[in-house]
UniProtKB/Swiss-Prot annotation:
GO terms for molecular function: ATP binding; tRNA dimethylallyltransferase activity. Keywords: ATP-binding, Magnesium, Nucleotide-binding, Transferase, tRNA processing. ATP binds at residues 17-24. The record marks 108, 130 as: Interaction with substrate tRNA. Belongs to the IPP transferase family. Substrate binds at residues 19-24. InterPro entries: Dimethylallyltransferase, IPT, P-loop_NTPase. Signal peptide: none annotated. The keyword Ubl conjugation does not apply. GO terms for biological process: tRNA modification. Residues 42-45, 166-170, 247-252 are annotated as: Interaction with substrate tRNA. This is tRNA dimethylallyltransferase. Gene3D superfamilies: 1.10.20.140, P-loop containing nucleotide triphosphate hydrolases. It comes from Erwinia tasmaniensis (strain DSM 17950 / CFBP 7177 / CIP 109463 / NCPPB 4357 / Et1/99).
């Protein structure tokens, strides 16, 4: 939206960036200087009992800057972009009513997109249709279903790996329910966000620095008890790798290790690689993002000053 169309709207701030880029530290610093309240935009931080492997803000950090939308789901539960949009809008309205500015911080870019642009009118999940797809997969295999999706919706099929049953079944389910492809329906936008948003992205200047930060943080997680945390989840017996919670980077690789499918060193290597792949996807999203102010995570003081400078230059 242009400045003209956002005139008179309440203000909001987006602080985006790849994993391990220093978003939380900057958000906490801004909380000390501005009338902001924080909302987490992270599909992993919603889960209770998944603290170390998700790099959830510590108790000390949360005391300085409480985050909304943390610990709102059990790991056995799913949480959609539509649910995030609904919940975030409620939190943003409450913060605005209190005379403060919502500061949304995190790296789940799909959530930001859903919030900014609204959601496409996708049909709700249908257990009967999903069961039929599962049955087809049991008989013919997921690769056969992927070939079927290639015929129905080649654009979606090109994006979805044959070994990703969750996304594959959803793409087929949408078509079987609505008669329209996922690609067709996602071109239809929903309601635009009724806020004047200032958007910032913080990231290291080079890919090597991102990789270095990710490796350091993964080893820190292990030293802080990540394996014990994952073992407690594994021991529950009701969680598995098809669930969004256990598909989170680090947890999926730890699950394979705990199941005896891989050794410790391989788990560490795969966990770091998966986190690097996540950061790469996040950076791909961000490079195509409009109206974003870039910040260098290697210069936190300059990043902090830049945010204050941009915000003070805005009218209102």
């Amino acid at each position: 939206m242009s400045e003209q169309t956002t005139a008179g709207l309440p203000k909001a701030i987006f602080l985006m960036g790849p994993t391990a880029s220093g978003k939380t530290a900057l958000a906490i610093a801004l909380r000390q200087a501005l009338p902001v309240e924080l909302i987490s935009v992270d599909s992993a931080l919603i889960y209770r009992g998944m603290d170390i492997g998700t790099a959830k803000p510590s108790a000390e950090e949360l005391a300085l800057a409480p985050h909304r939308l943390l610990d709102i789901r059990d790991p056995s539960e799913a949480y959609s972009a539509a649910e995030f949009r609904r919940d975030a809008l409620v939190e943003m309205a409450e913060i605005t009513r209190r005379g403060n500015i919502p500061l949304l911080v995190g790296g789940t870019m799909l959530y930001y997109k859903a919030l900014l642009e609204g959601l496409s009118p996708l049909p709700s999940a249908d257990p009967e249709v999903r069961q039929r797809i599962e049955q087809m997969a049991g008989e013919a295999g997921w690769e056969a279903l992927h070939r079927q999706l290639c015929d129905i919706d080649p654009v979606a099929a090109n994006r979805i790996h044959p070994n990703d049953p969750q996304r594959l079944s959803r793409a087929l389910e949408v078509f079987f329910i609505s008669g329209k492809t996922l690609t067709e329906l996602t071109k239809i936008s929903g309601e635009i966000l009724p806020y004047d948003v200032s958007q910032f992205a913080i990231a290291p200047a080079s890919r090597e620095l991102i990789h270095q930060r990710i490796e350091q943080r993964f080893h820190q997680m292990l030293a802080s008890g990540f394996e014990a945390e994952a073992r407690a989840l594994f021991a529950r017996g009701d969680l598995h790798t098809e669930m969004p919670s256990i598909r989170c980077v680090g947890y999926r690789q730890m699950w394979s290790y705990l199941a005896g499918e891989t050794d410790y060193d391989d788990m560490v290597y795969r966990g770091i690689c998966a986190t690097r792949q996540l950061a790469k996807r996040q950076m791909t999203w961000l490079r195509g993002w409009k109206d974003v102010h870039w910040l260098d995570s290697e210069q936190p003081d300059a990043a902090y000053s830049r945010v204050l400078q941009v915000l003070s230059a805005k009218p209102g």
